[in-house]
């Protein structure tokens, strides 16, 4: 026996008692089933705040019940339940997946012996009366023998032997059980000997249904209460969370007003339309391994792997003392591992800052794809004299965050980051359908475009701890600031043009792509010069245009010029 | 290897394994377990006979991130105290000024940070037993005993240990290539090296090799069967453990031990241990 049963509950008869009560309740529930269903209906209706005529429902169901032939005159009473030997439950196989749909599934063998069950009820022996009661008034002849004749009946099932192989599925919502290979045997004894063979025959026939349908559904319903502790409250909480979710969605749904439409930059719209139309061709230019895409600044899906393989990671980290210009990021190992070469340690060639920034970057990129952890967990454990008290909070966040809740970012970029994240994820999903239309707001569109093409770090995700010092160093770089104007707010067209040009100028000539250059571990990246997005002011809207670059191509994309021909 | 660990002495100390087991069990009985777990205890603990290698790689000033974190925290607490009419956001210079007004930690000469390489590939093993309990219809009605034997723990990482303003920061920085461990990984990987690169790049895995052997169920009076080596369960536990560590102690997350004692305690001597 793999499962251990608490023997005490069998010895002190408490298990038998609870089972007897439950069975009594269950067996009588059939009679009151209709009423119960009505209750549920009306309950649901009330919750849905639609007033439905409960009276009507009740009356109709009563009629339906009356029209059934019912020979039971009183409730079914379970007199005795006894398990003299403890049932045996063995686990034969186990599979754990950890997914909410199916947390675990297992195969179990159940066997029990010598069990005893005795039920008692009263039946109506005058079956003519039963028919008379349900037949319509106009039927003839009228019965004279319309007295009731109630007979008590006791049925005893003894020596119950059950052996079954069951499949058990544990889900978030409850436990599902299916019975296979059931072998059941029992001695049946009825107080009315005349009926015994007939009842026994019918019982054996209906046993299949019991194990196939009745028991699994009963167990599932029962288990739902274990998983949700108290069913009603959990119901409301899930409802609540759903409401919350829909409210959030409503909150972040884009509304395009006339004012917004004025803000849409024609340049961006042009670029976006080029992008979409290029997807409609069968051009194979972009499959050339050397280039990421035919459209500058964008990444084609088939080159994604090529692109990600050049992301900074410790395997292609060349150490701190390397010359930045010579440092060419090579395609790192295929095993998708982020390991610091041991040789670097041996040569004591460790650039701590570079390692830190790479690890932070990878972490942030993980956020953008998984969307689960937003802020790194930084637990604080206060150590006092002898005893430890673990303050279960993620660093300086307010104390109302409990340990299990997702940590919210507290750094100054909080607002911008989270809102951009949600907008991005929302618009990305809707992108496929609305790609061609120009109805959504331009800023969000373009940012979602870039993110749908390459799941890089959310662009507003500033490296959390870069602060004042960086700001100062940046102020010196007026050109970058110029382009910052573009990112921080949407100004008139003139400004956009200016920023486009200026951002173009700031590009290194060997950096083919703006985004790529941010990702690559060039010297620029490793050195403490912050990336653009680390000082975007938090509450401003901003957008990222993935196409802000054009150097060595013939079809230069300045505003004054014609857009490139569609490929 | 910078630190010489006298492992032989530890290993020969027969009492040690027992005391460690007792200490851990004492701790496990003191914590509150969820209602479906019962009887969690360490059954066996063995130190193994191979010592971990600890190498000190760098001693430097602590990185700015730690100061930022402390300052941010101070700021938050200060804001909470002076919380009044003003409740708008964190941006802007105003808050920063206020932070300076209240309290700010600056780098001091006593602050220090160690970059330590830790390597372990020994044969330490722990056996844990627990019972999954079904509290229905009566309390502890049915129990499923589970025994886990954890062994073959291997890691090779760089960690950052910083001490500043009476706080100790600890974080796993990155994994280091290791011929033995890397080979282990490829064997354990079911999909093979080519297919495994589907997911996003893993920042760090800290525990690179780990074997868990499971036993589910228990024989009762020589009756019934015990389910051994449940592969899916082992994989599941491994992933959970890795995820947990990565989430909690891998850079940019860290653990912060605060040794600071507020002065309102009876003792006003600042102890640092």
From Swiss-Prot, chain A:
Protein biosynthesis in keyword set: no
Chain intervals with Low complexity compositional bias: 417-452
Residues annotated as domain SMP-LTD: 1-224
Keywords in alphabetical order: Lipid transport, Lipid-binding, Membrane, Mitochondrion, Mitochondrion outer membrane, Transmembrane, Transmembrane beta strand, Transport
Keyword Membrane attributed: yes
Alphabetized InterPro entries for the sequence: Mdm34 (IPR027536), SMP_LBD (IPR031468)
Protein's membrane topology: Multi-pass membrane protein
GO cellular component: ERMES complex
Biased composition (Polar residues): 392-416
Spans annotated as Disordered: 392-453
GO biological process: mitochondrial genome maintenance; mitochondrion-endoplasmic reticulum membrane tethering; phospholipid transport
Any one GO molecular-function label of the UniProt entry: lipid binding
Subcellular localization: Mitochondrion outer membrane
Subunit description: Component of the ER-mitochondria encounter structure (ERMES) or MDM complex, composed of MMM1, MDM10, MDM12 and MDM34.
Domain-level remarks: Lacks alpha-helical transmembrane segments, suggesting that it resides in the membrane via beta-sheet conformations similar to those predicted for other outer membrane proteins and porin. The SMP-LTD domain is a barrel-like domain that can bind various types of glycerophospholipids in its interior and mediate their transfer between two adjacent bilayers.
Function: Component of the ERMES/MDM complex, which serves as a molecular tether to connect the endoplasmic reticulum (ER) and mitochondria. Components of this complex are involved in the control of mitochondrial shape and protein biogenesis, and function in nonvesicular lipid trafficking between the ER and mitochondria. MDM34 is required for the interaction of the ER-resident membrane protein MMM1 and the outer mitochondrial membrane-resident beta-barrel protein MDM10.
Family membership noted in the UniProt record: Belongs to the MDM34 family.
Name listed for the protein in its UniProt record: Mitochondrial distribution and morphology protein 34
Organism annotation: Vanderwaltozyma polyspora (strain ATCC 22028 / DSM 70294 / BCRC 21397 / CBS 2163 / NBRC 10782 / NRRL Y-8283 / UCD 57-17)
From Swiss-Prot, chain B:
Transmembrane segments: none
Membrane topology classification: Peripheral membrane protein
UniProt-annotated stretches for the region Disordered: 76-98
Keyword Transport: yes
Molecular functions per Gene Ontology: lipid binding; lipid transfer activity
Subcellular location: Mitochondrion outer membrane; Endoplasmic reticulum membrane
Family membership: Belongs to the MDM12 family.
Function: Component of the ERMES/MDM complex, which serves as a molecular tether to connect the endoplasmic reticulum (ER) and mitochondria. Components of this complex are involved in the control of mitochondrial shape and protein biogenesis, and function in nonvesicular lipid trafficking between the ER and mitochondria. MDM12 is required for the interaction of the ER-resident membrane protein MMM1 and the outer mitochondrial membrane-resident beta-barrel protein MDM10.
This protein's domain notes: The SMP-LTD domain is a barrel-like domain that can bind various types of glycerophospholipids in its interior and mediate their transfer between two adjacent bilayers.
HAMAP family: Mdm12 (MF_03104)
UniProt protein name: Mitochondrial distribution and morphology protein 12
Organism in which the protein naturally occurs: Vanderwaltozyma polyspora (strain ATCC 22028 / DSM 70294 / BCRC 21397 / CBS 2163 / NBRC 10782 / NRRL Y-8283 / UCD 57-17) (Kluyveromyces polysporus)
Originating gene: MDM12
